[in-house]
Regions:
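Small, basic N-terminal interaction modules of short regulatory proteins
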Residues: 1-95
Length: 95
């Protein structure tokens, strides 16, 4: 998993599988896009204005996400620094 935050744009991008080909993108809400592969597995999530509550529960219930990735996504969303995202470059999270 790789997490990147673009401060200028206010966009968080979470890559679950690097190099995986994205077949389609689904808009979950006004500020959340989910990239899927041809099997319907989540390959990436883009969150505009990530300081808001974004629909992680809906993403996890609607799409295929590995258990380890789901756990890390929950930690990212609810951790002590959630909503702040002070990092400007890639943050590599090892599962």
């Amino acid at each position: 998993m790789k997490v990147q935050y673009d401060q200028a744009a206010g966009v968080l991008y979470i890559t679950l599988a690097e190099g995986a080909q994205v077949s389609r993108t689904v808009q979950v809400d006004a500020g959340t896009l989910v990239d899927l592969d041809r099997f319907g597995s989540v390959r990436g999530i883009e969150v505009i204005r990530p300081g808001r509550t974004w629909p992680l529960d809906e993403i996890l219930s609607r799409f295929s996400v590995a258990d380890a990735d789901a756990h890390l996504l929950r930690e990212l969303q609810s951790g002590p620094d959630s909503g702040r995202y002070a990092f400007a470059g890639p943050l590599h999270v090892v599962a």
